[in-house]
Amino acid sequence: MIVSRAFAGKRYAVLGLARSGLASVESLLAGGADVTVWDNREEPRSAFEGSCTIADPLSIDLTGFAGVVVSPGVPLNRHPIADHARAAGVPVIGDIELFAQARADLPPHRVVGITGTNGKSTTTMLVHHICAAAGLPARLGGNIGLPILGQEPLPEGGVYVLELSSYQIDLTQSLACDVAALINLSPDHLDRYDGFAGYAASKARLFAMQRADQHAVFGCGDEHTLEIAREASATHDTGFVHVVQPSALHGQLEWPSLQGPHNLQNAAIAVEIARQLGIAEDIWRSALASFVGLPHRMERVAEANGVLFVNDSKATNPASTAPALGAYPRIHWILGGLPKSDNLDECAPYFDHVVAAYTIGEAGPRFAEILEPVMPVTRSEMLCDAVRQAMEAAQPGDVVMLSPACASFDQFRDFEARGDSFRQIVEALIEDREAPCPDGTPT
């Protein structure tokens, strides 16, 4: 694990003992900190009896504490811990801030921080893959993979590649990334912020924490991202702010797991990061070709009778579905779920790529009303029915794509469960077996 002398003799409270919370407690204890822990569940907190004080931070005087460590899932705009800590003059932080404080005790290294509304995980994995191809020791962390504090420190010259959500940035005060990147920005998670401006300000803080001589990389696909790039230009030295033009990157047909305009943007961001890490073009080009995409993100799950089946269950809003529709010319589009938007305006430029649509879930009726004037629509309701109907209609050369433009919680536990169900249904139908069909309630 990552341990630092910076924690020695200090008092911390850790609220929530899930993965990042557990890693934080163990790192703090190993670093010599005095730790108070709490979780609403008895089992995880009982594991620290004898090594930590067991107490709810809301019930104690926090004066003199160095920080209250919470998970990114704690809504700071609603949870009482924020006001309680503020009254005691104590910062509310996350495990990424503890990592930032521990960096001085690590062997010389670099940190890449990647954020954005869509494409974070793919871009982060791609940067990690490129680093590995270049022979650089690298670790994944943040919003992907294992908690960063629970991983072994890298040797000298290593690169920590962090996917950072806005929630994690909110809990971070001193992470000066050697290379920081903002892929894109569109409305999301607005229940946690004072409107879109608050959400954008959260993303912008990643660059405010940098030094003037550290690299800031930006996509060019939306005005909100470009505005943050302009702000960074005022605080960074000349030549350290890079606005990426995906159209300048050629060879996408050679990268099977990076199809579609959104993946061209993800690749362009990753390539610019690689350049700033000093990785040669022949290495990153080879890595783009060998990259295997993440599950549920434009995942090619099967091909049968000339029809390709693509699982893009991670597309939980119209902005992330739109570029998926741009990836193929003839798509049977399965969409719907728990809506984040009552329109599909961002998808409209790619409607001519859609042969037919199949609507499911709570958003199904509304989306059907939007689409019926411009394309054939089947009101399928259930995913298993939609896949079966799309498979029956598809011709050789067509693509059957689940790209829901919605959250999953009306019918599935999460987007992973939805994508897994799609894969299982496709495999069953190809093998001429009865397709599994959930009852329409999340499990």
Swiss-Prot record:
Q: Which residues form a coiled coil?
A: none
Its localization reads: Cytoplasm
Q: Which biological pathway?
A: Cell wall biogenesis; peptidoglycan biosynthesis
InterPro entries on file? Mur-like_cat_sf (IPR036565), Mur_ligase_C (IPR004101), Mur_ligase_C_dom_sf (IPR036615), Mur_ligase_cen (IPR013221), MurD (IPR005762)
Q: Which UniProt keywords apply?
A: ATP-binding, Cell cycle, Cell division, Cell shape, Cell wall biogenesis/degradation, Cytoplasm, Ligase, Nucleotide-binding, Peptidoglycan synthesis
Q: Which GO terms describe its cellular component?
A: cytoplasm
List its EC numbers: 6.3.2.9
Binding of ATP: at which residues?
116-122
Q: Where does the protein principally reside? A: cytoplasm
What does it catalyze? UDP-N-acetyl-alpha-D-muramoyl-L-alanine + D-glutamate + ATP = UDP-N-acetyl-alpha-D-muramoyl-L-alanyl-D-glutamate + ADP + phosphate + H(+)
Q: Report any one BP term from Gene Ontology.
A: cell division
Give the top-level enzyme category. ligase
Pfam families this protein is in?
Answer: Mur_ligase_C, Mur_ligase_M, MurD-like_N
Q: Which domain of life is it from?
A: Bacteria
Q: Name one GO molecular function term.
A: UDP-N-acetylmuramoylalanine-D-glutamate ligase activity
Its job: Cell wall formation. Catalyzes the addition of glutamate to the nucleotide precursor UDP-N-acetylmuramoyl-L-alanine (UMA).
Please give the family membership noted in the entry. Belongs to the MurCDEF family.
What is the name attached to this protein's record?
A: UDP-N-acetylmuramoylalanine--D-glutamate ligase
- The gene from which this protein is expressed is murD
